[in-house]
């Protein structure tokens, strides 16, 4: 999946979002609270090769935000809120990243990260609601995948409570019905 394909998948997901949200039984939830920002995620599949995740990020300071590579190509849209995003890139699959850019991402921003040696962190300045799509995971044994890429599997993370899910879907139901600021 390249940048254009990732952004096209994101557009498809955003168009389908009101319909996807109506069937809450198809979504899995997770509270990612081992590193900041704390993330509340529900995810489902748009098709066999594209997962859609709806995130709520709690605020955190820039020095608390976890810099990480993703284990798959993806694209992101901010539906509400804003965050500071640091970007880095590793030269090899074993090196720590060098800083590339720091960006202020606002409501309506969209971007793709489809290069496996790219790292990023997000520092929400206010509570943020985002949509993420991702393609299949990069194989861990290929020469271009970073050795520190991680997933949430096997970390003992818990699902959202019923009340958290209701609140999460209510916000995304509201947000999915309005155009993005940068459309």
Which residues does each PLM region occupy?
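Short, conserved beta-strand element in jelly-roll/cupin
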Residues: 69-85
